[in-house]
Amino acid sequence: MKDRIKEYLQDKGKMTVNDLAQALGKDSSKDFRELIKTLSLMERKHQIRFEEDGSLTLEIKKKHEITLKGIFHAHKNGFGFVSLEGEEDDLFVGKNDVNYAIAGDTVEVVIKKVADRNKGTAAEAKIIDILEHSLTTVVGQIVLDQEKPKYAGYIRSKNQKISQPIYVKKPALKLEGTEVLKVFIDKYPSKKHDFFVASVLDVVGHSTDVGIDVLEVLESMDIVSEFPEAVVKEAESVPDAPSQKDMEGRLDLRDEITFTIDGADAKDLDDAVHIKALKNGNLELGVHIADVSYYVTEGSALDKEALNRATSVYVTDRVVPMLPERLSNGICSLNPQVDRLTQSAIMEIDKHGRVVNYTITQTVIKTSFRMTYSDVNDILAGDEEKRKEYHKIVLSIELMAKLHETLENMRVKRGALNFDTNEAKILVDKQGKPVDIVLRQRGIAERMIESFMLMANETVAEHFSKLDLPFIYRIHEEPKAEKVQKFIDYASSFGLRIYGTASEISQEALQDIMRAVEGEPYADVLSMMLLRSMQQARYSEHNHGHYGLAADYYTHFTSPIRRYPDLLVHRMIRDYGCSKEIAEHFEQVIPEIATQSSNRERRAIEAEREVEAMKKAEYMEEYVGEEYDAVVSSIVKFGLFVELPNTVEGLIHITNLPEFYHFNERDLTLRGEKSGITFRVGQQIRIRVERADKMTGEIDFSFVPSEFDVIEKGLKQSSHSGRGRGSNRRSDKKEDKRKSGRSNDKRKYSQKDKKKKGKKPFYKEVAKKGAKHGKGRGKGRRTK
């Protein structure tokens, strides 16, 4: 019908709806309703338009008008940006040119204004068509409302990028107003109705339920905890222990002294290690990984669900696992003194950290000990009680520490970059309310195990690359020159001399920059800026190496319980050599699996960040009005972001500054016009907590004059100076986007901090508490 409508309108130019219905033979009551639905859909897709007189015309593009296709990224203030595949720079879309597009939509745009690199302005575009909507479901609390009697009410969603209300059709069940609903979008905003229309899919819970806030975030991203019945049944059919038949054909390593090293609260112990000195002076390192693929067979219900999830998701108070706990905490957990099926990379490593010989094979092991990071760190620190308790493996642990140092030095020499930044762990009570924020600890034990996992991943990747077989790689491509240039400019603002251009700067030069700022207050901020200049690591069927690790070959082999690519690698280790057809099969399935796994990983990261921001804001609600010392983590036109020692970050907007401030883009500073008070990244300042909003995850601070203030008077204004207080209050562009940065203030808090009577200061003993909590959310750190 659409094609016939277009033909008539092309021929006639303009028609009324009645004339069109008559021409199409759609003037019966039933057919006319069908025609109206089709016309509404075509108008929404900008294929036709209704003129002011009510007639219909085709939406015709202007002659010679070039259109582009991209993804729309909405800002909560109404404007947005369109990213184009293969292009570094985004297109700016003003509020009046959004044309009802919403975040994630695939859109067609025309260029209104080209970019001006001299002025630093982005190209501007207008959205002329929405090719595909990305948002199909929304989660939020129902607000009963009689304003539109046709509907039950509207949804209050945490999604700040949805500016129009979402009205919900009256469902069969009676709503009380406390329900958190998952709804399906039936109609999107248009010229006819500036709101969404949705139908109830499910009742997620109620606003009074414990943990409903986190569940709402997860459900909104379609991250679901419950497994389908068929998956649960398959998991329950898996035995509690391997049989003698299961062990046939495997290398028997049950007599080796192997042990796990994990966080104190970890239950899915999926990796174990052994080490021994060889007669030739080299060390043998064995990395043994639970053979999940033996129980999760290709094409099974377990396998399909694992691929759909592709990764476990770790948020503040829970884990949404890739596989049922029956597997991850049961037969696939390498608990001490029980037989377990594993896949092992056994490597002979010389004094330079080079793998000179290796075996990758299916094995059976029996771990001797279940060690924690804190136990191993204590042993290495000389704790006599712990050394006596674990005397059988003290020598092994010391050899491991020695090997770790060798491997770390080897990676540094070849150019590997270190992106270590402070990471917070939010502690919650039984009601899900945050009670403290501590820093995660990374002692020798944590870094040592990560180092061994990296070595195993590299060895497995190189093995398959040299066999020239279809394989899945974890790749990290070279950064784009434009982003490296931004980092160089940023680093230069600290007085650092940078050698080499953005397109040719070496990893060693980037290492030198980071070494030069070690111990400085802005070191972590600079490390975060370097990380942001990098491309995102992803999975691929093509080997492009790993830039951050300076590795020619890399994959993920060490966590099949929580990452699907690792599960696939284990499957390939077992299946290759069985037949020629198996290589052809893997060649066909790997690209789709790589894309799915990369997308699911990004979704998991987004969920983790959103929950963390929400919980940090909820935590800081208790401290509104309090004053603290903080460190400036980044400076933008509209203000400065500052960070507390527990990683909580907030914005001091220019409207919360006491005078007019000039923004210097070249030096990344804000300077008071009258006082000369100047803010720089890494500088310590005094702040007051003004606002914390759990719903949006935003925290606002204000500036408090103190002895930390730096005054620079009489300095000539840069031609790049931005506007100060008030002038930037309203903005239609990127400058109002909240950005994050990381900094670590190594100074102690001032004793002048105001505290509410009887209230525990949230920064108390941050480091000490972090040491008690081991892996936490935890295995997420092994994701390079």
Positions of predicted regions on the chain:
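Charge-lined substrate channels and their catalytic hotspots, especially those that engage the 3′ end
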Residues: 1-286, 293-339, 370, 377-378, ...
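Basic/aromatic-rich interaction segments and small domains that mediate binding to polyanionic partners
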Residues: 86-87, 100, 638-648
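Intrinsically disordered, low-complexity linker and terminal regions at domain boundaries
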Residues: 105, 125, 653-699, 711-718, ...
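A generic structural signal for residues embedded in beta-strands
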Residues: 109, 183, 635, 687-689
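Phosphate-interacting basic helix/loop segments used at nucleotide- and nucleic-acid interfaces
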Residues: 184, 253-259, 264-282, 400-414, ...
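Conserved catalytic alpha/beta cores of large enzymes that bind or transform nucleotide phosphates
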Residues: 312-412
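Append "with occasional cross-activation on large, charged helical scaffolds in nucleic-acid assemblies
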Residues: 360, 373-644, 658, 662
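Intrinsically disordered, Lys/Arg-rich low-complexity segments
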Residues: 714-784
